[in-house]
């Protein structure tokens, strides 16, 4: 018997944040897609603004490209930014490149980038 969409959503709702991150990564790999691309494509369609292409970006994703040499400091910075536990933050850093924060304001994204780079990480804003 196949699982219904409702069953799948309920199973995802019971997962930890790190399990969901790993699930998304596995789905991206299996299906050859990117979750960030789906959000970027869906956002203009939801807004319905044809002239929105020239508008300034208001939401940013903070992507940890690599932890660099000071991995412990980067894990501490990730914990401070996200509020994750030690294990979850370590898994996020070990899984780089990985999203640290998604859909945040430019100021929040710049602050997170600054903290991570001071800790020794390479960071991208998208």
Swiss-Prot record:
Record's function text: Forms part of the ribosomal stalk which helps the ribosome interact with GTP-bound translation factors. Is thus essential for accurate translation.
SUBUNIT field: Homodimer. Part of the ribosomal stalk of the 50S ribosomal subunit. Forms a multimeric L10(L12)X complex, where L10 forms an elongated spine to which 2 to 4 L12 dimers bind in a sequential fashion. Binds GTP-bound translation factors.
A cellular-component GO term for this protein: cytosolic large ribosomal subunit
GO biological process, alphabetically ordered: translation
Coiled coil: none
CDD domains per the UniProt record, alphabetical: Ribosomal_L7_L12 (cd00387)
InterPro entries (UniProt xref): Ribosomal_bL12, Ribosomal_bL12_C, Ribosomal_bL12_C/ClpS-like, Ribosomal_bL12_oligo, Ribosomal_bL12_oligo_N_sf
GO molecular function annotations of the record: mRNA binding; structural constituent of ribosome
Record bears the keyword Ribosomal protein: yes
Signal peptide (UniProt feature, chain positions): none
Assigned keywords, A-Z: Ribonucleoprotein, Ribosomal protein
Domain of life per record: Bacteria
Protein family membership: Belongs to the bacterial ribosomal protein bL12 family.
Pfam families: Ribosomal_L12, Ribosomal_L12_N
Protein name: Large ribosomal subunit protein bL12
């Amino acid at each position: 018997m196949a699982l219904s969409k409702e069953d799948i959503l309920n199973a995802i709702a019971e997962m930890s944040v790190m399990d969901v991150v790993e699930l998304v990564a596995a789905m991206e790999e299996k299906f050859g897609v990117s979750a960030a691309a789906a959000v970027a494509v869906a956002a203009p369609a939801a807004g319905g603004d044809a002239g929105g292409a020239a508008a300034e970006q208001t939401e940013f994703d903070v992507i940890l490209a690599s932890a660099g040499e000071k991995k412990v400091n980067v894990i501490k910075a990730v914990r401070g930014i996200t509020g994750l536990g030690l294990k979850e933050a370590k898994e996020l850093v070990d899984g780089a490149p990985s999203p640290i924060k998604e859909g945040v304001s430019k100021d929040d994204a710049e602050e997170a980038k600054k903290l991570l780079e001071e800790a020794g990480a390479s960071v991208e804003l998208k």
